[in-house]
């Protein structure tokens, strides 16, 4: 993509069948941006990357743009394998710890009742929501026990280049995109996508959330970027 920036694509077992991940050269090692979900196929894909693309250097840092399973799922495995730290916003880290250990907010009876109260009455659809009680924990069975916090406006030095964190809301609790002036790149995660609409939802955990306003307001944070910035989306 650019000097020191490699584009990886890994499969997902959904209708949205892939995720774009990023490998950034970082001095004597590599920084991974986003992880893929926890399954054997994704682990095998990463092992192929480790065998062919690292040039003998280790992974020294894992960054997750946000807590969703396709972005954070394998963070525990990657950080344990390479004995490195996870970098993520505090809000998403703690939300992931909660979601991976409970059935809150992503499916089950409470979610079905919440959606029914807003007009979802189709029995088949409600049955699917009830069946998702273990949805998040199934793809994020573990979250690293420690992390380093990403903050809005924070500059992260990766390979001698400054990458600025841009917080976004509405899609995830506290999503962090990464923008590099020198390379004219924006790793947008799920906040800016080229073809599909970003998932902007309200869950039973925060029933009065105004997620759409949060998301639309967040988009204004990208308006100052130069027109020639290359956007690297997750899907």
What are these regions (language model features)?
Residues 1-4, 158-162:
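Conserved N-terminal entry element of GNAT/NAT acetyltransferase domains
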Residues 2-57, 84, 178-188:
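Conserved beta-strand hairpin/beta-sheet module of binuclear metal-dependent hydrolase folds
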Residues 9-12, 71, 167:
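Conserved HGGG/HGGXW glycine-rich cap/lid loop of the alpha/beta-hydrolase fold
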Residues 18-20, 98-102, 198-200:
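Short aromatic-enriched loop/helix-cap "lid" or pocket-rim segments at secondary-structure transitions
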Residues 30-40, 136-147, 155, 162-234:
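Metallo-beta-lactamase
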Residues 41, 51-157, 184:
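Active-site HxH/HxHxD metal-binding segment of metal-dependent hydrolases
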Residues 46, 234-235:
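Adenylate-forming
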Residues 46-49, 74, 218:
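A general structural detector for well-ordered alpha-helical segments in enzyme core domains, enriched
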